[in-house]
């Protein structure tokens, strides 16, 4: 139902309905009432400071602070007048309207409004509702003229206060009673929030947006609407009783350079979303899921038993039962009994936990947010006036398009939108610091380091060791995997999540049971003093700064001198640079000196060395050791040599203690004389084995992200600061030198200080790209070399034990496995002979780390210099070289990385490669690969098709370069040297085959070049080779144009995907590997190579009998096999079989099919196979009791007859790239009995005149045995492909 946001002024009179005097839960019957405003149903705002659990002196800044991991701002005068309270109220109304302005936000509000707490908690008997509970009811004071004041109870879902003592600390507070929380136990309870919209956090953007403008790594201030929505997600979790506040990530504080901070709850990681939930292991994910499911079952049990509301006899039991059924998405049978529908629960759970997240909302609202919950927070800023639409609007927030603020989130950028905020007074700012004091060399020198800047390293006790537990495996053991994703579009469009039942009355009897736990807040000391002789990253950063009151500074290469003397700044750049920077020049030489030193700065900052695969890192930034003293003193002097010896470990301040448990054993349940259950137990053990591998990998990734990658992140932050400090010192030196000249001398100096700043920032941006690549590569290298092998070692031990136990289990039960024991042993041996490969993208969605992992994991990708991929309705370069990609309007894109080029003038893609790539004479050693789909020729245009050539990709400069073109059934690769000499190599496919492997079908093209040869590989196999020894230098353009250019038909088009260029000649094995990787997918494909879809019409194609098709036999419920007609005009070119012939089948999803978020058919899905006949949907069945090896399939209208089976499992045909699949009939999804495979068989028929045999659409037990005997026999008649009608094939 539509959400209505109410409007108020603070001075509006109390009406006892929308404006009331409320006694909040923590007032505990003291008679402290607050003026409260109902901003929308069940949500109240109290424009007062949140004081519960605090002392009055807590509201003043002192030597102590509350949370040790943030900057805290105090102002005891905030909200101390009615005018200030009115501004707060109006601002909150505006923020709620901003939330409501988009469907996603309105749905969030709808679910909060309708997520009313259960009328009771764990103390209430099962058969009762009870409203006299502090987590359900609050009191309001009703006061009318001439009447005695009286209390009345009301139901509320959320009460929002102003802030507590700290203005920039926003928090959602749930209500505990005797140390139990309804918000965590399925019931849900009233939620409270302390919130301040004006003072917002600031974060930076060091890691993101390669190649973006120089402003893009400045500080960004948060959008208060997003801050509020973050808290509202906590509220939503609390109202549904799924708040996860008992699974902390605990910081390790063993060293003085580690953050001292409160534990981070899993609730925060789920609420933030993005990459952060990756820190929660898969087994923990599952335990949380199971706990919520168990709690919801408890609610079901209560609803089925509740008979009365003892605290309020006016409560209509049935109305509330119906409301709670709707809230929890329970189902009700004909007898009125409630139960949980697992699919509905699964959808609700995932929408709450993985759909509503800060990162999803930020993307939907186009708001800039932090990269991670762990991102550093900078001191907050005060937004000047959120009510001013020139500063902040309901539709766009700060990023107002009319003010050109929407690009790159300019409206949130501190450097750009300065009119939106003001810096806060340092007088009221408290920051928790570590004071590091030197006891030698520079005695008495202490530096203050903000706690936020220290290393966050999680303690190993933060992670569950559930993997070490033994597990019983039975025939019905369920999967533990929880897919932690919920597409945002599905969340917006899913009407099932919207309540269709009106809210019950909010009025009830007054609350008299004030049993509630009020949190008590204790202060912490603000500064911790440490004496140390270690020189850490923090001392080195401090040595690169200078006091603001000192202007005459100089650079030094001595770290100790920089600590001792405040006018000296440590520099890690070369001595030549330091000497030039410190050089004093005459006024006439000043401009030239400035130009030189600024250029030198850019050169120094961008120094990097390409290493020959040392420690799996191809790029190293050599000055990191000198800049931050990472590693140790010996590494500092020769960082590259030390790195070569020790690898990425040298960068870590703290080598983490890893939790890598011994994997617990499987206990296999025995079943007497039950073959099906025994086989199902074996299958479940093998499936659970994969889950153990996945869970172990997930545990390792969780520890890596929170113990290793956090250290590398701090190093990146440190290098960003170091480069900025170097730039600030240089700018100060330049300004000081300039200012000592006379006015006359200055007038003759032509210099632009803004230009200096711009060039320095540009140099820093370029350097940060190198640093990010280097540090990210080190982090992934540490994961792959130091962590994953330890996990694999434990997993292989587990596999060996499992294999032994399974083989013994088969031997013990061979009496019941007659005819199957050897096959089951073979299956176990095959399954356990290979390790499960590690894929980082399964465990985190951090695209930067995944990209680095992919580069690490493939020798090929380390040489890739252009890699076009789809993202957000555009093509981007994922090679890391940042090519500029312009996609014109006439190009069609889709999210399968495919793009379509037509003959239209604006159907074009322009790729401008990074100028850092040296691309001259590249033909001496380079490769190009891509997938292509070329449509079928037109029958009446065959001559043009054969003879006309058109270019599809062009990379030419001054008539030299390379191009790819098509002429008929030829793909042609052409090289042209600087003298105009041309060499070509081509691949030609046959168009006279009955069924072509290439026409309109995706195939993989790889072209390689070296000094001697140019080669073309198709689908991984070498097809053509040409000598190019006599060709000279080729100068290729840095610009690549994708466009159909030449003598072409106006309807001509092609499809392409996965275009890549490599700066090496790929080997045969490289190409085969790449073909196999890019061919693989989790879903099945149709005849053309596109995803196989549910609810789409297909003609069925038998790969073993290509010229056959299926037709419903007249007056008979069977499918006869007929021969495809042949098209041939006595042409030497045209010869093909019709594909669009026979019945058009439709794959329908069976209820428990895996793929529930889209219409793609995945491997092992359970399906129905249907088709339309006489405008009625028919289905493919098999008789339950057929006795022969083969039986004709029964084709009939859909029915519930128990004579037939209709459950089909659609399986991948082959491990190798293929578009074929097999259709396996089973009794049902739980059964291990394989009834037979769908295929073609010749049946004997007795005719009137003579006997004959005829082929029919059948189910076959023979195919089952043959597939096991020869699993990859291409000619088997049980291998099927599905042909949809396509614009690229006309008949």
Curated annotation (Swiss-Prot):
InterPro entries the UniProt entry points to: Bot/tetX_LC (IPR000395), Clostridium_toxin_transloc (IPR036248), ConA-like_dom_sf (IPR013320), Kunitz_inhibitor_STI-like_sf (IPR011065), Toxin_rcpt-bd_C (IPR013104), Toxin_rcpt-bd_N (IPR012928), Toxin_trans (IPR012500)
Regulation: Proteolysis inhibited by EDTA and captopril, and by peptides that encompass the VAMP2 cleavage site (Ala-Ser-Gln-Phe-Glu-Thr-Ser and Gln-Phe-Glu-Thr). Translocation of whole toxin into neurons is inhibited by toosendanin.
Gene3D superfamilies: 2.60.120.200, 2.80.10.50, Clostridium botulinum neurotoxin b, 'coiled-coil' domain, Metalloproteases ('zincins'), catalytic domain like
Residues of the signal peptide: none
Full protein name: Botulinum neurotoxin type B
EC number: 3.4.24.69
Domain of life assignment: Bacteria
Species per Swiss-Prot/TrEMBL record: Clostridium botulinum
Cofactor(s), by name: Zn(2+)
Keywords: Disulfide bond, Host cell membrane, Host cytoplasm, Host cytoplasmic vesicle, Host membrane, Host synapse, Hydrolase, Lipid-binding, Membrane, Metal-binding, Metalloprotease, Neurotoxin, Pharmaceutical, Protease, Secreted, Toxin, Transmembrane, Virulence, Zinc
The reaction(s) this protein catalyses: Limited hydrolysis of proteins of the neuroexocytosis apparatus, synaptobrevins, SNAP25 or syntaxin. No detected action on small molecule substrates
UniProt binding sites for D-galactose: 1240-1241
Binding-site positions, a ganglioside GT1b (d18:1(4E)): 1025, 1189-1190
Catalytic residues in the record: 231
Cofactor note: Binds 1 zinc ion per subunit, to the LC.
Ranges where the record places region C-terminus of receptor binding domain (C-RBD): 1080-1291
Single annotated GO MF: metalloendopeptidase activity
Assembly notes: Heterodimer; disulfide-linked heterodimer of a light chain (LC) and a heavy chain (HC). At pH 4.4 in the presence of ganglioside GT1b may form trimers. Interacts with host receptor synaptotagmin-1 (SYT1); interaction is improved in the presence of gangliosides. Interacts with host receptor synaptotagmin-2 (SYT2). SYT2 interaction and toxin uptake do not require gangliosides but are improved in their presence. HC interacts with a complex including at least host synaptic vesicle glycoprotein 2 (SV2) and synaptotagmin-1 (SYT1); copurification does not depend on glycosylation of either protein.
Residues where Zn(2+) binds: 230, 234, 268
Pfam family, one: Toxin_trans
Result of changing residue 1199 to Y: Increased binding of heavy chain to host SYT2, no effect on toxicity
């Amino acid at each position: 139902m539509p959400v209505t946001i109410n409007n108020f002024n603070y001075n509006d009179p109390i009406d006892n309905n929308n404006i009331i005097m409320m006694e909040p839960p923590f007032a505990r019957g003291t008679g402290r009432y607050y003026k409260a405003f109902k901003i929308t149903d069940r949500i109240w705002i109290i424009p007062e400071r949140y004081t519960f659990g605090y002392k009055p002196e807590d509201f003043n800044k002192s030597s102590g602070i509350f949370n040790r991991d943030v900057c805290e701002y105090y102002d005891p005068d905030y909200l101390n007048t009615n005018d200030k309270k009115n501004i707060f109220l109006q601002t909150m109304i505006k923020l709620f309207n901003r939330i409501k302005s988009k469907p996603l936000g309105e749905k969030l509000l709808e679910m909060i409004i309708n997520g009313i707490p259960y009328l009771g908690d764990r103390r209430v008997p099962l058969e009762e509702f009870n409203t006299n509970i502090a987590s359900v009811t609050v009191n309001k004071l009703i006061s009318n003229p001439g009447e005695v004041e009286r209390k009345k109870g009301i139901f509320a879902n959320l009460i929002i206060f102003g802030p507590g003592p700290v203005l920039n600390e926003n928090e959602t507070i749930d209500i505990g009673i005797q140390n139990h929380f309804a918000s965590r136990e399925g019931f849900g309870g009233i939620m409270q929030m302390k919130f301040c919209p004006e003072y917002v956090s600031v974060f930076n953007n060091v890691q993101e947006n390669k190649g973006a403008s120089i402003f893009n790594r400045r500080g960004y201030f948060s959008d208060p609407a997003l801050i509020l929505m973050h808290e509202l997600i906590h509220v939503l979790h609390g109202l549904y009783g799924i708040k996860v506040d008992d699974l902390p990530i605990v910081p390790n504080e063993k060293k003085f350079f580690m953050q001292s901070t409160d534990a981070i709850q899993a609730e925060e990681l789920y609420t933030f979303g993005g990459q952060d939930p990756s820190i929660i292991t898969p087994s923990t994910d599952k335990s949380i899921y199971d706990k919520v499911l168990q709690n919801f079952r408890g609610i079901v049990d209560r609803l089925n038993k509740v008979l009365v509301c003892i605290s309020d006899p006016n409560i209509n039991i049935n109305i509330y039962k119906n409301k709670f059924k709707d809230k929890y998405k329970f189902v009700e049978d004909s007898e009125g009994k409630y139960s949980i529908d697992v699919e509905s629960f699964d959808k609700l759970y995932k929408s709450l936990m993985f759909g509503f997240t800060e990162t999803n909302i930020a993307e939907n609202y186009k708001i800039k947010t932090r990269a991670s919950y762990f991102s550093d927070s900078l001191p907050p800023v005060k937004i000047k006036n959120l009510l001013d639409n020139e500063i902040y609007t309901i539709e766009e927030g700060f990023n107002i398009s009319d003010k050109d603020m929407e690009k790159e989130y300019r409206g949130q950028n501190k450097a750009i939108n300065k009119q939106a905020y003001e810096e806060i007074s340092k007088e009221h700012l408290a920051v928790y610091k570590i004071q590091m004091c030197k006891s030698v060399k520079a005695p008495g020198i202490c530096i203050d380091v903000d706690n936020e800047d220290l290393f966050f390293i999680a303690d190993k006790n933060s992670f569950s060791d559930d993997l070490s537990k033994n597990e019983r495996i039975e025939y019905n053991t369920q999967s533990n995997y929880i897919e932690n994703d919920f597409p945002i579009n599905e969340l917006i469009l899913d009407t099932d999540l919207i309540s269709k039942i009106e809210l019950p009355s909010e009025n009830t009897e007054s609350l008299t049971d004030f049993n509630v736990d009020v949190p008590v807040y204790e202060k912490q000391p603000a500064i911790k003093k440490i004496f140390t002789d270690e020189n850490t990253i923090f001392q080195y950063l401090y040595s690169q700064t200078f006091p603001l009151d000192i202007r005459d500074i100089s650079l030094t290469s001595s770290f100790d001198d920089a600590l001792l003397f405040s006018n000296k700044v440590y520099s890690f750049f070369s001595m030549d640079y330091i000497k030039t920077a410190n050089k004093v020049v005459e006024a006439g030489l000043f401009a030239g000196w400035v130009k030189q030193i600024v250029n030198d700065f850019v050169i120094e900052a961008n120094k990097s060395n390409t290493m020959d695969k040392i420690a799996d890192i191809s790029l190293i930034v050599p000055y990191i050791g000198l800049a931050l003293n990472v590693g140790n003193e010996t590494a500092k002097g020769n960082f590259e040599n030390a790195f070569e010896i020790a690898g990425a470990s040298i960068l870590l301040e703290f080598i983490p203690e890893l939790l890598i448990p011994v994997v617990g054993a499987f206990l296999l349940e025995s079943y007497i004389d039950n073959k099906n259950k025994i086989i199902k137990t074996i299958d479940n053990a093998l499936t659970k084995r994969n889950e153990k591998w996945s869970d172990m990998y997930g545990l390792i990734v969780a520890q890596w992200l929170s113990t290793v990658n956090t250290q590398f992140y701090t190093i990146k932050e440190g290098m960003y600061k170091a480069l900025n400090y170097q730039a600030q010192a240089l700018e100060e030196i330049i300004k000081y030198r300039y200012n000592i000249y006379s006015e006359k001398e200055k007038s003759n100096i032509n210099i632009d200080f803004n230009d200096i700043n711009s060039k320095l920032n540009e140099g820093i941006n370029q350097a940060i790209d190198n640093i990010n690549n280097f540090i990210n590569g080190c982090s992934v290298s540490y994961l792959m070399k130091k962590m994953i092998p330890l996990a694999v070692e434990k997993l292989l031990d587990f596999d060996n034990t499992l294999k032994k136990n399974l083989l013994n289990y088969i031997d013990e039960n061979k009496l019941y496995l007659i005819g199957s024991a050897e096959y089951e042993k073979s299956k176990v041996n095959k399954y356990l002979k290979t390790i499960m490969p590690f894929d980082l993208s399964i465990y985190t969605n951090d695209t930067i780390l995944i990209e680095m992992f992919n580069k690490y994991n493939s020798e090929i990708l380390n040489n890739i210099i252009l890699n076009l991929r789809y993202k957000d309705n555009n093509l981007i370069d994922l090679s890391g070289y940042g090519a500029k990609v312009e996609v014109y309007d006439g190009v069609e894109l889709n999210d399968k990385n495919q793009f379509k080029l037509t003959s239209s003038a604006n159907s074009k893609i322009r790729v401008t490669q990074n100028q850092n790539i040296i691309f001259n004479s590249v033909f001496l050693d380079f490769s190009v690969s891509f997938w292509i789909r070329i449509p079928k020729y037109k029958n009446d245009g065959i001559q043009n098709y054969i003879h006309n050539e058109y270019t599809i990709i062009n990379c030419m400069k001054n008539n030299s370069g390379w191009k790819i073109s098509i002429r008929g059934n030829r793909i042609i690769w052409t090289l042209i040297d600087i003298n105009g000499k041309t060499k070509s190599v081509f691949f030609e496919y046959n168009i006279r085959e009955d069924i072509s492997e290439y026409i309109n079908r995706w195939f993989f093209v790889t072209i390689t070049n070296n000094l001697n040869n140019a080669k073309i590989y198709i689908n991984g196999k070498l097809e053509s080779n040409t000598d190019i020894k006599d060709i000279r230098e080729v100068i290729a353009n840095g610009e690549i144009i994708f466009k159909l250019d030449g003598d072409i038909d106006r309807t001509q088009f092609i499809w392409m995907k996965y275009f890549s260029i490599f700066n090496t000649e790929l080997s045969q094995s490289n190409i085969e590997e790449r073909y196999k990787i890019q061919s693989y997918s989790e879903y099945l494909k149709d005849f053309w190579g596109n995803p196989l879809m549910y609810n789409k019409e297909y003609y069925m194609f038998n790969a073993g009998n290509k010229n056959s098709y299926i037709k419903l036999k007249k007056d008979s419920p069977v499918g006869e096999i007929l021969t495809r007609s042949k098209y041939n005009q006595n042409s030497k070119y045209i010869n093909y079989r019709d594909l669009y012939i026979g019945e058009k089948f439709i794959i329908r999803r069976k209820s428990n099919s895996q793929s529930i978020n889209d219409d793609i058919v995945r491997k092992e899905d359970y399906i129905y196979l249907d088709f339309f006949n006489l405008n009625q949907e028919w289905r493919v069945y098999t008789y339950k009791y057929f006795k022969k090896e083969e039986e004709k399939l029964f084709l009939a209208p859909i029915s519930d007859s128990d004579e037939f089976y209709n459950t089909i499992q659609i399986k991948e045909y082959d491990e190798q790239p293929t578009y074929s699949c097999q259709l396996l009939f089973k009794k049902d999804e739980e059964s291990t009995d394989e009834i037979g495979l769908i295929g073609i068989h010749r049946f004997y028929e007795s005719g009137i005149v003579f006997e004959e045999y005829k082929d029919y659409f059948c189910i076959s037990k023979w195919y089952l045995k043959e597939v096991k005997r020869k699993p990859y026999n291409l000619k088997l008649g049980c291998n099927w492909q599905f042909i949809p009608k396509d614009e690229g094939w006309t008949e």
